[in-house]
Amino acid sequence: RRNPANQLSLPDSMTSAYPNAKPQTQISPRFGLAYQLGDAAVLHFSYGHFFQMPPMYSLFQNHSFLIAPNDYSTVMGNAELKAEKTVTYEIGLWQQLFPGAGLEVSLFYRDIYNLLSTRIISTYNQIEYGLYSNKDYGNARGLEIKFDLATGPISAWLNYTLQYTRGNADNPQQTFSRSGASMDPVNRFIPMSWDQRHTFN
């Protein structure tokens, strides 16, 4: 009972039990629109919400709620984490260059909410530990250019993506680790570890 994350519920029977995680429901609206411009061009727009389940370790790590006697040595899973939510906007234009060949240029922007983070909690005897939570935010924006060619039985395509990805933490334990090293949290957007500026396919 000395661990604030290990609170037992006491129903009328006075039999202690761990509270159950609450079920979560997500609604994912998506919308797409395409408008033909003449005989050789199409303008398109799309909007959508996408969800991704947290990794299993962040839900069930250290499920026995055992805390090491040293500060910043323990990180616990959290069964009530929210799903990572991405809101995507995209607008693009496809243009036929000549019969069988086309060029598409698209701009996109993504807001990424509920990124995994680590909240710092103190036990009653002032031991600091981490609990996974949904505190971080990121976004991605960029440009995609695609050339497609189809002639007879042969088809090919080339794709180039320019992308900038930023967030307020590079990994779920960044703030926790910095606090353990007596460093202040990052107070600005920084490039994410999965930021890939140029991609050719």
Segments (PLM) and residue ranges:
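Membrane-embedded beta-barrel scaffold of Gram-negative outer-membrane proteins
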Residues: 36, 44, 48, 52-54, ...
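Membrane-spanning beta-strands of outer-membrane beta-barrel proteins
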Residues: 24-26, 74, 84-86, 138-140, ...
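Residue-level signature of outer-membrane beta-barrel architecture
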Residues: 25, 35-36, 49, 83, ...
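Signature of Gram-negative outer-membrane beta-barrel scaffolds
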Residues: 1-38, 64, 71
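Gram-negative outer-membrane beta-barrel transporters
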Residues: 108-112, 116, 127-201
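Residue-level detector of the transmembrane beta-barrel scaffold of outer-membrane proteins
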Residues: 1, 34, 42-44, 57, ...
